């Protein structure tokens, strides 16, 4: 039986259009040279399509296929910081409150370093965190990409690191916890919160001091 027929049978048997199915390794064996699916213009995100992941069988941790050298796309464009935002946080009668983000445009110099277009130092409150709005491109495609790793330094010392690779399947649902949603919904870039959201998995943050909060 092919996948479509098997899924249809399971949906009818369970009387539900929404089903999560788990199959054994021998259900649909794949040999080298077999066609599993087609990508590109044969499908789109507006209809049924496939996402591929490469995971370690024993740990179920993701492999980053580019970092591991499994695929080597042509990529001559470094990731780019577009804006930097600062959000002050506090607690009022036990309820967390956040200020409206203060936003600063960023330019990349010829030396490859970044500078704010804002004159003078950035003013920060008693406690807060930064949000980096970033994007990435790659040769030969029109897509824009997010980033899988961000490291923040204070006085030359790493104080925060976010890594979005090698996590297990069961915490995939938490992957958006690294985004700053109020900024993300109005941006075409990735808005990475440089602080750990309450409830976000610790494994996303191999380096962490004060949950990424900047205190003055």
For every predicted segment, state its role.
Residues 3-28, 53-136, 140-145, 159, ...:
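Acidic, glycine-rich catalytic/binding loops that coordinate metals and/or anionic ligands
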Residues 27-39:
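A structural signal for short beta-strand/turn segments enriched in small hydrophobics and glycine
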Residues 36-37, 81, 157-159, 216:
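Local beta-strand/beta-hairpin segments that build beta-sheet-rich folds
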Residues 36-43, 137-141:
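Inter-heme linker and motif-flanking segments adjacent to c-type heme-binding CXXCH motifs
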Residues 39-53:
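Active-site loop architecture of trypsin-fold serine endopeptidases
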Residues 149-153:
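Beta-strand signatures of extracellular beta-sandwich domains
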Residues 162-216:
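Beta-strand-rich ligand-recognition modules
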